[in-house]
UniProtKB/Swiss-Prot annotation:
Keywords: Acute phase, Amyloid, Amyloidosis, HDL, Heparin-binding, Methylation, Secreted, Signal. Residues 98-122 are annotated as: Disordered. Expressed by the liver; secreted in plasma (at protein level). Residues 95-122 form a propeptide. This is Serum amyloid A-1 protein. Residues 19-45 are annotated as: Important for amyloid formation. InterPro entries: Serum_amyloid_A, Synovial_Prolif_Regulator. The gene is SAA1. It comes from Homo sapiens. GO terms for biological process: acute-phase response; lymphocyte chemotaxis; macrophage chemotaxis; negative regulation of inflammatory response; neutrophil chemotaxis; platelet activation; positive regulation of cell adhesion; positive regulation of cytokine production.
Length: 122
């Protein structure tokens, strides 16, 4: 529902043309897919201390798609952090995750968070 509300808001309030609206949708979809790929890789790697790297990488890849990708990355990461906070995960870890998310979304190199020994596949 938030996705639909956000898209309608962008369309009506910001005066987005139909062509750029569909471009935004495509970027958002591809950005969400980038986030899912980073999450899947994190689960597959199962490497201690690598979560910040995968957070930054997913946000970086999504933001490279354009404004729609960056928007999708922000919505997904905020939702994930809010859910984790609700279930009692530490606030300190959540702040570190959000810093890694913002690092990636701002276009900075996600390898800054890459732990030593993480296989090159990732």
């Amino acid at each position: 529902m938030k996705l639909l509300t956000g898209l309608v808001f962008c369309s009506l309030v910001l005066g987005v043309s139909s062509r750029s609206f569909f471009s935004f949708l495509g970027e958002a979809f591809d950005g969400a897919r980038d986030m899912w790929r980073a999450y899947s890789d994190m689960r597959e790697a199962n490497y201690i201390g690598s979560d910040k790297y995968f957070h930054a990488r997913g946000n970086y890849d999504a933001a490279k798609r354009g404004p729609g990708g960056a928007w999708a990355a922000e919505v997904i990461t905020d939702a994930r952090e809010n859910i984790q906070r609700f279930f009692g995960h530490g606030a300190e870890d959540s702040l570190a995750d959000q810093a890694a998310n913002e690092w990636g979304r701002s276009g900075k190199d996600p390898n800054h968070f890459r732990p030593a020994g993480l296989p090159e596949k990732y």
